[in-house]
Amino acid sequence: MKKSILTHKIKFSAIFFWGIVFGSSFETDSTKKEIYFPATVTSSAGNEIDVAALAKAHIMIVITIKATWCPVCRQQLLRIKEQLGDFEKCNASFLVLSPGSNEAVHEVKFNTDFPFPFISDQNFSIAKKLGLILSPEEIMPAIVILNEDLSVKWIRKGRNILNFGDAELKDHLGCANWI
């Protein structure tokens, strides 16, 4: 009887562990419904960004952060910043989408020193289009690759301390070993 209880506890622990590691993330190819990113946006610094032109010149990757206070999201930006050399090989450019005021979002940019524009999605209009509203104050963390026409090519939703998604992004892009 005790062995049976122990076996069930071990099975439950394993399922619980894998649920934490992989349960908060999934990726999809955007083939079911066309979702388009806005052609122009305003950065947290107040600069207009021509996303349409960027998407024609680069592989556009949008990193969403849950909230300006999210430590895992900040860590994600630092992880990607450390790997920018790999992403430059495939001509990638980034935008960071966050809820919050321009000031709070710009502070995240300053604190992470991430060298790409940050966008404050104060009214959640972009997050809503992408299906990424987590709560009235939070956006679901995600990595989004845009096509040249600004439609969503690939999206990987979710992030946690054990599973950031940058490896999946690099695998999907397939350019880390380009010369």
Map each language-model feature to its residues.
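Structural microenvironment flanking redox-active thiols in thiol-disulfide oxidoreductases
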Residues: 75-113, 124-128
